[in-house]
């Protein structure tokens, strides 16, 4: 954006699984940089990881039981860093009912919070639930078509306008 290669009206971000953490934090810290973002099967409530099926991440991310590690987990926790009265970019947040790594309530909880605080005139927060696991299923191509159709729609690609 600074070098004029693009603008915020043409920029989208996608974060999958743990990649949803940096993308989610970028959206929270610099919402004005993005028109849209996709957070796909992402762990969005890191303070609660150890109380889920994803508790194997304790050696990687830390534990909320240690005060220093708690502070790091809080700093990267999407849900707890969502601010009131902010115009966030349009978001598509996905979760899978049978995800063996990310419990379905994590993306759902974050989507509900984004919907609660979003003040954008054209802001869209969608929560899409599938029934496969963390790595998708045989309908993965359809899922990706849905995901990219959302992003192109939000980026005002004329081929993806609603009719």
Predicted segments with their positions:
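Active-site-proximal cap/loop segments of hydrolase catalytic domains
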Residues: 1-163
